[in-house]
Amino acid sequence: MTLAETFNTENHGNPLITLNYEPALESLGNDYYDEVTAAEFPQLTLRWRNDAILPRLGLNPQIVTDEDFITAFGLFQGRKPLLALRYHGYQFGEYNPNLGDGRGFLYGQVRGTDGELYDFGTKGSGRTPYSRGGDGMLTLKGGVREVLAAEALHQLGVRTSRCLTMIETGLGLWRGDEPSPTRSSVMVRMNKSHIRFGTFERLHYFQRSDLIKKLLDHVIEHYYRHLAHESDKYALFYAELVKRVAELVAQWMAAGFCHAVLNTDNMSITGESFDYGPYAFIPTYNPYFTAAYFDYYGRYCYIQQPSICQWNLEMLQVPLRAVIDKADMEAGLAKFSEYCHAEYNSLMLKKLGFEELKTPEAEELLSLTLKFLQESQVGYHQFFYEMARTFSIKWRDEPGLVLSGSDIVPPSGTDANFDNWCVLYHKILNNFDYEQVKIIAQNLTHYNPKTSLLRPTIEEAWEPIVQEDNWQPFYDLVKSIQSRG
């Protein structure tokens, strides 16, 4: 009996297969993709299903079975064509024309209950014409890490993809940077679009300005619909993309998130965060923290992320000049820093409890906060969580009480900065009445959840899987993230 025969293959009963899929990208023609076949796997075990996002697809989680997930996204029955998307990209600043979906494909596109178009994109589903000698597979740990990153960022308010499901596939993989053989998985990502900056860069490489315009019209039609009937829709599209990307990177920075691989092929044309590889959340405020061991010169370190995203947007201008006036794009890009700075300041103030502050106070508080965090190397997440945990309305009346019951212990030599910060925070609180201070307390709790996704936390969830096939710590961690515990 084959693996497929052990599962119910009556596709008409599988709500994941009978969704109303739209051939939006497929209708563009095969200049943008290759039709591929999914790999066959020796053993399929459902390890994760994201019931939280099924209602957005119009599905009741109670009627979608584990078997439905395996049949749809492990056996890949009932969906054709499967599309490996073509793209190029700047990787660590160097143009690479040998890219494309090398271990995944576009499974399908479906309209959500919100009227938006969503992609189901696989990772680890087998070789494609763009695998470049790779096996087309995803390690189980890679799948686990992407699930955790997406859920954590979503709860922190970052515009991000989500993981719909993760299935263990029974293959042993050999990887130079992991103990091998290591276990394997297929992960299905749900996001607005898998069209990347590098999708346009590839078309420019082949001098296909006609295909650039066709793709740009498609992007505006489906993802910037409010611009579709504007006379200057192309320039407005680029200006809005700049704003989306600037706000996205500000969201990363406030969350203490380091993406690690900000190549142009990892930049979404919708301004979403996706494709999580060797990412990390900063343990302490070190501006030059670098997440990827192979980023030898720190190109994608934490503090460089805004400038790198701005550079990526500048590189995108090259293919888009086939449609959009260069001066219009430069005018749009000129606002990047303004957008990023405004979003970052707003988010950081919220982490400190404030919806808004007068500019001088806001800048002084943010500057002093980052100065203390950098000099003291107190945990980045710990600092804000301890504010939320120990906040008292009495902080308004007495500066000596600010953070007095917390676990924040400033190292020797940083006491003065800490004291200055406490005095300033008290001074600002004193401008608010008691009812407003209660709202500040609520903001602190909302924007600073207890659970953080530092690397040791991920390892604590992963090691029981490796040692005992015990998934409970992983499930507990996901539950804690989703509940903002």
Swiss-Prot record:
Nucleotide-binding found in the keyword field: yes
Binding site for Mg(2+): N266, D275
This protein's record includes keyword Cell membrane: no
Enzymatic reactions: L-seryl-[protein] + ATP = 3-O-(5'-adenylyl)-L-seryl-[protein] + diphosphate; L-threonyl-[protein] + ATP = 3-O-(5'-adenylyl)-L-threonyl-[protein] + diphosphate; L-tyrosyl-[protein] + ATP = O-(5'-adenylyl)-L-tyrosyl-[protein] + diphosphate; L-histidyl-[protein] + UTP = N(tele)-(5'-uridylyl)-L-histidyl-[protein] + diphosphate
Keywords: ATP-binding, Magnesium, Manganese, Metal-binding, Nucleotide-binding, Nucleotidyltransferase, Transferase
Required co-factors: Mg(2+); Mn(2+)
Pfam family, one: SelO
UniProt xrefs under NCBIfam families: PRK00029.1
Function: Nucleotidyltransferase involved in the post-translational modification of proteins. It can catalyze the addition of adenosine monophosphate (AMP) or uridine monophosphate (UMP) to a protein, resulting in modifications known as AMPylation and UMPylation.
Name this polypeptide is given: Protein nucleotidyltransferase YdiU
Source organism: Nostoc sp. (strain PCC 7120 / SAG 25.82 / UTEX 2576)
Gene expressing this chain: ydiU
